[in-house]
Amino acid sequence: MFTGIIENTGIVKEVISNGSNRTFWIESPVSDQLKTDQSVSHSGVCLTVEEVAGNRHRITAIDETLIKSNLGSWEPGSLVNLER
């Protein structure tokens, strides 16, 4: 369960379209502490960490999540609130 307290912020570094889904690479000071399959709140949306590479981690949002949240507007440089 998330506390609602933002732990840190990240920056969208890369956006990859996969059909109607989007994959995001997020750079943050806590990325190297994350683990694959860990749930992390990204600006209020709970997403599963798919890969960690140094100070970056990868997540994917499906089309419905992109429609019902602000993730559809994320682009490189967008700030992301992170909560574990």
Where are these regions (language model features)?
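Conserved loop->alpha-helix
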Residues: 1-84
